[in-house]
Amino acid sequence: MSLASGPSSKLLLFSLGMGLVSGSKCPNKCVCQDQEVACIDLHLTEYPADIPLNTRRLYLNNNKITSLPALQLGFLSDLVYLDCQNNRIREVMDYTFIGIFRLIYLDLSSNNLTSISPFSFSVLTNLVRLNISHNPHLLYLDKYVFANTTSLRYLDLRNTGLHIIDHNGFHHLVVLQTLYLSGNPWICNCSFLDFTIHLLVSHMDHPDAQNATCTEPAELKGWPITKVGNPLQYMCITHLDQQDYIFLLLIGFCIFAAGTVAAWLTGVCAVLYQNALRTSSGDDTEDETGSRFANQIFRSNTHLGPIRRFPELI
């Protein structure tokens, strides 16, 4: 009897088939056990292949990975924990995590992130902890980045290149409890006022509040951003500097000068118009007087009767 027809061979084929379906193969040099895959300190430059499809916890930290492929990640529909810290990931594209909507924990800290697309986290409605700290080239966060992460409770933004942030981006984070903001070059100008007010009224925990300070302007350098609300409000809403008064004075003078010139031009135009009217009426009067004089002569001749003719000599 051949191996292909025996019961043991059928069992082997069935086991192999189940293995392919469940994706039980483990990536080279990684450690796989109990739905957990650890590919740590392996100097990987790419996302590893052959990750089991039933993986729930994936550790890719301390490698040289430059990007996260949405297609391969999308097969891990049961993934709840993803650690990618200390890699070389440069950007997170729209819908990178579209297939792992059950994700609860995401760590992208200590990478080379320069941008995060507005819809990068759009499907991560179950995300509870997000760490994107220590990305010094990350200068900007779109206000829609956190629009759908409504379950987020922990957010770490330490030591990035962020210097300004839109307070509207935090309106959807209604359950956010802990926010780290230190180590960023915050520019505390009037555009920053709304965010400082949000920090005060949201009652979030800021464990590093004393180290989250302003770098500009000079008069607010070193101020904790959680305490800079009142000085900013004074500077931006109720306070006028000497330069502001000079500017207002110049505006007032320009308005006065423009009004004076406009009034003078109006007066000149009115005088010229009146003179033109008078000249026109004078000409009309002379024409009317001449007409009357001619009519009087004609009438006087009419009263004298018919004009006598001299007798004809021949």
Swiss-Prot record:
It is found in: Cell membrane. PROSITE patterns: LRR (PS51450). This is Leucine-rich repeat-containing protein 52. Testis-specific (at protein level). At the mRNA level, also detected in kidney, ventricle, spinal cord and skeletal muscle, although at lower levels compared to testis. Expression in testis at the protein level requires the presence of KCNU1. Auxiliary protein of the large-conductance, voltage and calcium-activated potassium channel (BK alpha). Modulates gating properties by producing a marked shift in the BK channel's voltage dependence of activation in the hyperpolarizing direction, and in the absence of calcium. KCNU1 channel auxiliary protein. Modulates KCNU1 gating properties, shifting KCNU1 gating to more negative potentials at a given pH. Residues 184-238 form the LRRCT domain. Disulfide bonds join C26-C32, C30-C39, C188-C214, C190-C236. The chain crosses the membrane at residues 245-265. N-glycosylated. It holds the Pfam family LRR_8. The lineage of its organism: Eukaryota, Metazoa, Chordata, Craniata, Vertebrata. InterPro entries: KCNMA1_auxiliary (IPR051432), Leu-rich_rpt (IPR001611), Leu-rich_rpt_typical-subtyp (IPR003591), LRR_dom_sf (IPR032675), LRRNT (IPR000372). One of its GO terms (biological process) is potassium ion transport. Residues 1-23 form the signal peptide. Its main location: membrane. Glycans are attached at N112, N131, N148, N189, N211. GO terms for cellular component: plasma membrane; voltage-gated potassium channel complex. Residues 24-53 form the LRRNT domain. The keyword Transmembrane helix applies. One of its GO terms (molecular function) is potassium channel activity. It is a single-pass membrane protein. Interacts with KCNMA1. Interacts with KCNU1; this interaction may be required for LRRC52 stability and changes the channel gating properties.
